[in-house]
């Protein structure tokens, strides 16, 4: 080891008596300075325009996206190392000094380890350049997430060391430094793209994925340290250092060709085995370095997986080859992406097993029938399979897939079926940018197989809003639209309809919804609803202006009334009957997501809403959930013509000003259980058209989901909201930005340049 350390010291002397080492340090410092100051400048501008509060500021500046400091520089680091490593051994070969090393009492491994340790020190100096920006971040960002950034630096350091080992081996192959550098770039490219090769072959796919360098350092930069990634870099370093030792040793000794060949094979096989075995789910250790544990599933999800015990969860993915919108996301080439998506869950439950079924069947897509041109489905499959170089025999026919499972109710879309202890449920994909189910939907699907499902019944018989229609005023989007992520059926609920004309309302449902009936409730219906209320059933009642007389008789038994008239709101942009209501502190108790919406001063849109009045005569504790803006809103009596002249307040016509509640929560104890009722003066806030509103940023989704979650006593949706970050403020000014630019663009690079120049001049004089 002493000899290796001495070689390392001599190699460092050689490195720093060359302008390349100094130049690379200066270039890296300037490059980092430009990225850092540009990001800080944008943050300073945002601070002046929108206020001083941000979210996850450390991540945004250092690791959050491709424009952040560490990822942006990571893409260019491969250019640095070959310029240093190209001369490590090539210089010895070309100058003849390798013969002196051979004749000295030094072992080959000491030569290789010494050279590599010199590179480890130089890489540490490169990391030290990053340290200057960490110091700046600590000064300018209160609650700076230091551990997150250190995790990123650790990943970059491992990557630099792996690059150095590769460059050292390439330098052992030739006496020409330029050839060594080019060869190093070739190996870098191979390791970057090997993970995309032969992805349709099962074992080869796993092997190439475990050998691929792509994404390894990025995971560490994101704050997730895994033994899989650390072992990968260790295996790469072991591989190329081992190959370097064997190469030099083979030129030093005379042995049959199969001896060094066997050594090469052993080192390669050992390295591949290390990379493959350490990437298997049961052998991976994790450490989440982020302050909010953003790389780890929430505690609620962890607890849910723990409750499943030792029984396995079977996940079967059904992919329709003819559904071109989704199949490319679930093809065999994407299998490793699927494994990575489920890795956070497998981390806490290793016996989640995955199965993949590929089939073809018709889908409700006009482009499919346009593509057929009279062909059969089988002929179309053969044509597409030939074009994509796939075996058509891997796809089950419609008859074969229907013997296993009938996916026509799912429109033969890509879907996953979860099985656990004899129960099963579907886990769907969605028509949004995220596409795949998030932690919330996965948690809901798993919990659906473990408990009795909360059921929401929608009253019918009085022309109420429909839960199954897609018309503007109806509720399919919120309740039963399978391709919509936030639909109740995808959040863990069951939804159904019920007619109180012919049957009693079950008392074991989560809630009954009475959504804007257009006809008066009959005495029998009122009696059955009252019986349900008296038994402690939860209830959602939604009314509309102009129909107060329909619901007020029922509401009177609750101590609530819908006031006559319509609330209007002055606005330069919207119709006067579109009221943008504020959330209240009472909403914070419904869900964490709604609490965050309240803290963010979010609004809920209610087009056509009336005010609610209440008293305590029925024994309920009443809290407003939504209130209209007292400055711009008033209650207009009489008919409202929204598309006529500008609506104005008229006390003479009976118009009222004041604080108007548009949604109320009512609670009381019945038979030892808290009864929960919500009354709203508008039924459109849950409608298909309102949930699709694009001209105002509203919290209708969050508000509606929170209400039904409240009815289920927190069973669904699963709460996966994460805590807010503490590093949300920037202690920075325009003058400070100028100082930082001066330091990182001028002072620091200038000091390095002067120091390196003086050292090189003194060395030349000697």
Which stretches of residues belong to each language-model region?
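Selective transmembrane-helix segments that form parts of the transport pathway or gating/packing helices
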Residues: 19, 77, 81, 108-137, ...
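Hydrophobic alpha-helical transmembrane segments of multi-pass membrane transport/permease proteins
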Residues: 19-45, 72-81, 187-190
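Terminal transmembrane helical anchor/hairpin motif
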Residues: 39-64, 173, 180-253, 625, ...
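Long, hydrophobic alpha-helical segments
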Residues: 65-91, 126
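Hydrophobic alpha-helical transmembrane segments of polytopic membrane proteins
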Residues: 150-176, 239-241
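Extracellular ligand-binding/catalytic regions of CAZymes and related secreted enzymes
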Residues: 254-282, 288-307, 314, 439-455, ...
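Juxtamembrane extramembrane loops of integral membrane proteins
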Residues: 280-414, 420, 426-435, 439-443, ...
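Acidic, S/T/G-rich, low-cysteine, solvent-exposed domains in lumenal/extracellular/periplasmic regions
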Residues: 476-714
């Amino acid at each position: 080891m002493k000899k290796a350390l001495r070689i390392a010291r001599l190699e460092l002397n050689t490195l720093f008596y060359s302008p390349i080492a100094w130049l690379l340090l200066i270039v890296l410092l300037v490059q980092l300075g430009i990225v850092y100051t540009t990001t800080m400048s944008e943050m300073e501008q945002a601070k002046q325009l929108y206020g001083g509060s941000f979210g996850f500021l450390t991540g945004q500046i250092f690791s959050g996206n491709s424009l952040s400091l560490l990822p942006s520089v990571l893409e260019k680091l491969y250019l640095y190392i070959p310029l240093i490593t190209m001369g490590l051994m090539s210089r010895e070969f070309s100058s003849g000094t390798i013969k002196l090393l051979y004749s000295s009492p030094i072992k080959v491994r000491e030569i290789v380890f010494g050279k590599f340790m010199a590179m480890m020190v130089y890489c540490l100096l490169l990391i030290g350049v990053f340290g200057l920006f960490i110091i700046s971040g600590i000064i300018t960002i209160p609650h700076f997430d230091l551990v997150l950034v250190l995790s990123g630096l650790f990943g970059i350091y491992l990557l630099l060391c792996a690059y150095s080992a590769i460059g050292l081996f390439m330098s052992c192959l030739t006496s020409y430094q330029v050839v060594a550098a080019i060869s190093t770039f070739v190996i870098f490219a191979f390791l970057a793209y090997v993970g995309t090769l032969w992805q349709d072959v099962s074992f080869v796919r796993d092997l190439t994925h475990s050998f691929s360098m792509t994404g390894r350092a990025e995971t560490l930069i994101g704050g997730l340290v895994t033994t899989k990634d650390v072992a990968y870099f260790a295996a790469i370093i072991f591989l190329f250092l081992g190959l370097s030792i064997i190469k030099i040793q083979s030129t030093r000794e005379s042995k049959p060709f199969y001896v060094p060949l066997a050594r090469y094979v052993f080192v390669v096989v050992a390295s591949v085995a290390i990379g493959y075995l350490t990437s298997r789910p049961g052998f991976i250790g994790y450490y989440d370095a982020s302050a909010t544990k953003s790389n780890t599933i929430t505690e609620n999800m962890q607890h849910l997986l723990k409750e499943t015990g030792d029984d396995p969860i079977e996940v079967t993915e059904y992919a329709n080859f003819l559904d071109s919108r989704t199949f490319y996301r679930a093809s065999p080439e994407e299998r490793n992406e699927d494994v990575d998506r489920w890795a956070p869950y497998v981390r806490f439950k290793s016996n989640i097993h995955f199965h993949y079924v590929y089939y073809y069947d018709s889908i409700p897509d006009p482009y499919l029938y346009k593509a057929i041109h009279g062909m059969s489905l089988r002929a179309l499959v053969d044509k597409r399979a030939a074009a994509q170089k796939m075996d058509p025999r891997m796809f089950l026919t419609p008859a074969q897939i229907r013997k296993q499972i009938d996916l026509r109710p799912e429109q033969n879309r890509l879907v996953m079926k979860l099985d656990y202890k004899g129960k099963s449920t579907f886990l769907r994909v969605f028509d949004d940018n995220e596409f795949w189910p998030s932690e919330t939907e996965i948690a809901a699907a798993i919990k659906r197989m473990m408990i009795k499902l909360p059921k929401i019944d929608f009253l019918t018989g009085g022309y109420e809003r429909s839960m199954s229609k897609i018309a503007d005023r109806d509720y399919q989007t919120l309740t039963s639209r399978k391709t919509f992520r936030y639909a109740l059926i995808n959040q863990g609920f069951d939804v159904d309809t019920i007619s109180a004309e012919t049957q009693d309302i079950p008392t074991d449902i989560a809630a009954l919804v009475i959504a804007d009936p257009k006809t008066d409730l009959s005495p029998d219906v009122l009696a059955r609803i009252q019986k349900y209320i008296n038994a402690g059933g939860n209830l959602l009642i939604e009314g509309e202006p102009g129909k107060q007389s329909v619901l007020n008789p029922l509401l009177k038994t609750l101590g609530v009334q819908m006031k006559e008239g319509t609330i209007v709101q002055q606005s330069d942009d919207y119709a006067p009957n579109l009221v943008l209501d504020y959330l209240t502190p009472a909403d914070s108790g419904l869900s964490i997501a709604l609490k965050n919406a309240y803290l963010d001063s979010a609004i809920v849109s209610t087009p056509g809403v009336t005010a609610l009045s209440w008293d305590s005569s029925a024994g309920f504790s009443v809290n407003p959930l939504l209130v209209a803006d007292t400055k711009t809103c008033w209650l207009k009596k009489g008919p409202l013509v929204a598309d006529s002249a500008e609506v104005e307040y008229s006390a003479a016509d009976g118009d009222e000003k004041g604080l108007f509640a548009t949604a109320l929560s009512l609670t009381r104890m019945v038979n030892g259980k808290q009864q929960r009722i919500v009354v709203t003066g508008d039924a459109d806030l849950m409608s298909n058209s309102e949930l699709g509103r694009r001209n105002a940023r509203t919290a209708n989704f969050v508000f509606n989901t929170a209400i039904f979650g409240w009815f289920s006593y927190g069973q669904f949706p699963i709460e996966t909201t994460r805590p807010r970050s503490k590093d949300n403020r920037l202690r920075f000014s325009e003058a400070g930005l100028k100082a930082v630019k001066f330091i990182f663009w001028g002072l620091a690079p200038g000091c390095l340049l002067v120091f390196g120049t003086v050292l090189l001049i003194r060395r030349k004089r000697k």
